């Protein structure tokens, strides 16, 4: 229509207004095949360009699956009010494809709606579709059913894996492709894979994933992300590179520039805090350092994404596990600027004030939306119970016990049952346990098999007659990072009694899904104190609101409120509460169901106005870490290497003059770069005879002379979890023991080692090791003090 040819000016205005409205409408939502493009986004020589103008991406990560759908708009409004102009979002493949070929894009999995709300709230979107995500999510978002192929190689060009990936990403393109900026939507970039440099070096695999996204209809700029030291592994030179780090942007961007001389600088994961794992201290970020590094990036025209801007909660059974085995809490608060419950923290307002100094032309910051109502309620008793052993399905008969995947089960628990003969006290041993095995004789618990310590055997008491042996296996989420991701769950055969293989098993599937919960037979009879059981109760509310369920009187398990699984709990902490969103509660009668595998002190529950995220109770743990006070007898004949590390934060690779063979590896710190009495290690990898990193599967910390657990999580296990943003740190809170410091790893089996990689602490410099000695030996020789 030529406006100039219309004689009636009012009509011309009406037609022009309608035409502009058509251009700015997201027609893809209404089913129109091609939506008009109203904006452009490109990657320039120095800057990101939005409609041809410099655009500094101020992004923050929020995962739709970790926020109730009813609260998506509120959290996105909070992100906008903090000063973000973009939100970054992972997709979790296993959430969207729970069974092969069955896709879910509704409810909590409606990521398209999340993106549409982001657009309505004035936010752009960076999409991270996978297929691998990490994110402390079950198996890094990879579907468990792939593990039904015993020999499948994940994150490789294995045809079975790639076929499944291509099917999934095609669905992602169908669902989210119309929401790209090139089609009138908010998605400005899409990520190829995720931190692949930590995992492999196959550029062919990365090319396959890139081409699959292109074939799925993604036509926005694609990019990949890695920490700078891993970036060149599998790096595609025709893809934009973004760096992940938690501190020191100047140094890390300098590393990025060596690999990518041109283009804007971007930190794709910048950490304001960290996630929590069961049994370790709650993490708090260094806010002053966070703000200082953030301002450096703002002042130097660098873009960034705060991971996490809002962490939320890993509801359901979706929480993952750090390597080699450190299960994550359901709370994903992350010490983020927006708290788990969506509150504006002091860090939120400090971040907002900082962003206000660097707004782009025409930008203003809206006021934060009001917080959701908070309620508390008095303790109520759960008066009904359903013992696990009295609510079993039909058994599967098998000669030897298999893992859960063998029986087509992905989540929940599994009970393995057999008969054993009368006899004297004797040893029960399994090949491995994934993850916790509660062992019962005739219904009475006699011990726990514990993957954390590689405890795969225990002493059974004397039996005057043949007895029923039950092993109730509880998985805690599959490993979500590193080569240990193919984390099959359950009892790993063979199972031996006094060295003889036990045969003839009944296997009971306990998936903890809606169907199973609906079939439970509750009674008013209380079970034995430590028998595994479901508990049920109701409580009345005058009005709904967010609350935190106090679980300090309970043991270990999972809980549901009005049919919604709130996640896992464990009395050892640090989390002692479960976030119950008000949108899942209602005025009047509410129902709660709690599975307790250990047995509660009292079957009562109360609602609190504030969470408890930082209360460790190690005395309640059924396993005490094996780090006894001792003096080491390190024989010089066991020494594989000695030398000095270079100062700074760069990864350093040490090659032994001669490969050494043993089951134990010891790194001894003789002094520190800064002369202080501390030692710290961000990450240790051991190298095989071919110079490749040895899998951490089965590794445990055999001994550490000192670790800080009061003021921060400086646990020794941090040195082998694959994460360079956290670290082992010797004690500094209530004491500061001096050098030498020793960390000994039990590798689970004898290995031939040709060297090791050492990653120094990446943030402040305290504890960076200067002079060291490395030992490899077959027997741990400790002399008790």
What name fits each language-model region?
Residues 426-440, 469, 539-562, 569-570, ...:
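Aromatic-lined ligand-binding clefts that engage carbohydrates, nucleic acids, or primary amines
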Residues 31-86:
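N-terminal carbohydrate-binding accessory modules
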Residues 101-107, 120, 131-155, 206, ...:
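Aromatic- and acidic-residue-enriched segments that line the glycan-binding/catalytic groove
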Residues 215, 246-339, 343, 350, ...:
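Catalytic-core region of carbohydrate-active enzymes that cleave or remodel glycosidic bonds
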Residues 395-399, 562, 628-662, 673-753, ...:
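Disordered, acidic Ser/Thr/Pro-rich linker "stalks" and the adjacent N-terminal cap
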């Amino acid at each position: 229509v030529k406006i100039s040819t219309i004689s009636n000016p009012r009509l011309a205005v009406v037609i022009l207004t309608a035409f502009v409205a058509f251009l700015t409408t997201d027609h893809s939502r209404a089913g129109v095949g091609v939506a008009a493009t109203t904006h452009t986004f490109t990657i320039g020589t120095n800057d990101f360009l939005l409609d041809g103008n410099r655009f500094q991406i101020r992004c923050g990560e929020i995962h739709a699956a970790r926020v109730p759908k009813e609260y998506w708009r509120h959290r996105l409004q909070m992100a906008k009010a903090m000063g973000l102009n973009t939100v970054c979002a992972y997709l979790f493949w296993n959430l969207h494809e729970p069974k092969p070929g069955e896709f879910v894009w509704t409810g909590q999995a409606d990521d398209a709606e999340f993106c549409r709300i982001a657009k309505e709230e004035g936010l752009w979107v960076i999409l991270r579709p996978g297929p691998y995500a990490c994110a402390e999510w079950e198996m890094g978002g990879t579907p468990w059913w792939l593990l039904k192929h015993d020999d499948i190689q994940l994150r490789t060009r294995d045809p079975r894996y790639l076929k499944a990936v291509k099917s999934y990403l095609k669905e992602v393109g169908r669902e989210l492709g119309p929401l790209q900026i090139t089609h009138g939507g908010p998605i400005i970039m899409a990520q190829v894979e995720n931190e692949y440099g930590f995992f492999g070096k196959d550029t062919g695999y990365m090319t396959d994933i890139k081409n699959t996204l292109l074939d799925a209809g993604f036509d926005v700029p694609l990019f990949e992300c890695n920490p700078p030291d891993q970036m060149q592994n599998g790096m595609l030179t025709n893809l934009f590179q973004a760096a992940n780090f938690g501190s020191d942007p100047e140094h890390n961007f300098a590393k990025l520039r060596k690999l990518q001389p041109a283009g804007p600088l971007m930190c794709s994961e910048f950490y304001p805090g960290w996630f929590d794992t069961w049994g370790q201290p709650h993490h708090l970020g260094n806010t002053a350092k966070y703000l200082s590094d953030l301002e450096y990036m703002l002042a130097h025209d660098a873009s960034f994404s705060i991971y996490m801007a809002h962490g939320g909660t890993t509801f359901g059974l979706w929480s993952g596990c750090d390597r080699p085995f450190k299960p994550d809490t359901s709370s994903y608060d992350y010490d983020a600027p927006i708290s788990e419950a969506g509150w504006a923290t002091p860090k939120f307002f400090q971040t907002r004030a900082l962003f206000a100094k660097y707004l782009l032309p025409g930008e203003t910051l809206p006021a934060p939306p009001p917080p959701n109502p908070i309620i508390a309620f008095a303790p109520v008793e759960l008066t009904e119970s359903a013992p696990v052993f009295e609510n079993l399905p039909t058994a599967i008969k098998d000669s030897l016990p298999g893992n859960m995947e063998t029986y087509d089960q992905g989540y929940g628990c599994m009970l393995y049952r057999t008969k054993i003969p009368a006899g004297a006290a004797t040893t029960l041993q399994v090949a491995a346990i994934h993850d916790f095995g509660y062992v019962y004789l005739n219904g009475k618990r006699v011990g726990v098999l514990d993957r954390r310590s590689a405890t795969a055997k225990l002493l059974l008491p004397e039996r005057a007659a043949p007895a029923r042996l039950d092993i109730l296996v509880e998985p805690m989420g599959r490993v979500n990072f590193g080569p240990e991701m193919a984390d099959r769950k359950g009892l790993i055969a063979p199972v031996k009694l006094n060295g003889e293989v036990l045969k003839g098993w009944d296997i009971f599937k306990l998936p903890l899904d809606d169907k199973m919960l609906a079939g439970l037979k509750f009674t008013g009879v209380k079970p034995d104190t430590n028998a595994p059981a479901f508990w049920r109760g109701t409580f009345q509310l005058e009005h709904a609101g967010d609350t935190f369920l106090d679980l300090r009187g309970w043991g270990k398990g999972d809980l549901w409120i009005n049919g919604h699984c709130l996640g896992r709990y464990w009395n050892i902490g640090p989390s002692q509460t479960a976030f119950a969103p008000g949108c899942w509660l209602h005025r009047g009668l509410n129902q709660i169901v709690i599975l307790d595998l250990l047995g509660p002190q009292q079957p009562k529950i109360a609602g609190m106005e504030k969470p408890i995220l930082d209360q460790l109770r190690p005395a309640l743990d059924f396993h005490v870490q094996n780090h006894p006070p001792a003096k080491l007898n390190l024989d010089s004949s066991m020494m594989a290497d000695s030398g000095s590390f270079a100062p700074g934060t760069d990864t350093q690779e040490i090659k032994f003059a001669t490969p050494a063979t043993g089951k134990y590896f010891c790194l001894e710190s003789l002094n520190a770069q800064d002369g202080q009495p501390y030692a710290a290690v961000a990450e240790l990898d051991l190298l095989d005879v071919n110079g490749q990193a040895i899998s951490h599967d089965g590794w445990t910390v055999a001994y550490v002379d000192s670790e800080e657990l009061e003021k921060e999580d400086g646990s020794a296990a941090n040195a082998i979890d694959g994460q360079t943003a956290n670290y082992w740190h010797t004690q500094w809170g209530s004491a500061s023991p001096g050098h030498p410091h020793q960390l000994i790893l039990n590798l689970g089996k004898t290995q031939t080692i040709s060297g090791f990689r050492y990653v120094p602490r990446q943030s402040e410099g305290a504890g960076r090791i200067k002079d060291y000695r490395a030992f490899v030996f077959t027997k741990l020789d400790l002399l008790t003090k």
